[in-house]
Amino acid sequence: MLTGSVGSHKALAYTGHYIAAKHGVMGLMRSFAVELGQYRIRVNSVHPSQVNTPMTMNEVTFKLFRPDLENPGPEDFAPFSQMTHTLPVPWVEANDISNAVLFLASDESRYVTGVSLPVDAGALLK
């Protein structure tokens, strides 16, 4: 199981280094799936959008999106984050990603390999 992001699927301005790395994750996943399939080893990846973790939910991010506020918080960042999603949520929760990983690792997905599963509240649709 590999973890990419929505950046594995599309370009985002001013983040070429990040996008290149995340596209690489998807390429590795596909190569591993082809190479290891003969041994019945499945390889997949999950691709979240903004996740409610310290990596996203921090003062630097809040100030990046709300430089006009002295002490912006999550509630100030939420409208900007939600604009990137099709579903009306500003971010996904870590357990949403975990649940996708559990599905892909389970017998319920025993014939699923080489799949990049977005957990992105519809961000890739925009």
Where are these regions (language model features)?
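Conserved SDR Rossmann-fold cofactor-binding beta-strand/turn motif
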Residues: R42-N52, A105, P118-D120
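Short, small/polar-rich loop/turn modules that mediate ligand/substrate recognition or access, typified
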Residues: G37, R42, V112-G114
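Short, flexible catalytic-loop segment of classical short-chain dehydrogenase/reductase
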Residues: P48-N58, F62-P67
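A conserved structural motif in NAD(P)-dependent oxidoreductases
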Residues: P74, H85-I97
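Active-site loop immediately N-terminal to the catalytic Tyr-X3-Lys motif
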Residues: K10-G16, Q38-Y39, D107
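Short C-terminal tail/terminal secondary-structure segment
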Residues: K10, V101-L102, T113-K126
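Residue(s) in the substrate-gating loop at a strand-loop-helix junction
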Residues: S5
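Active-site helix of classical SDR
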Residues: A21, M29
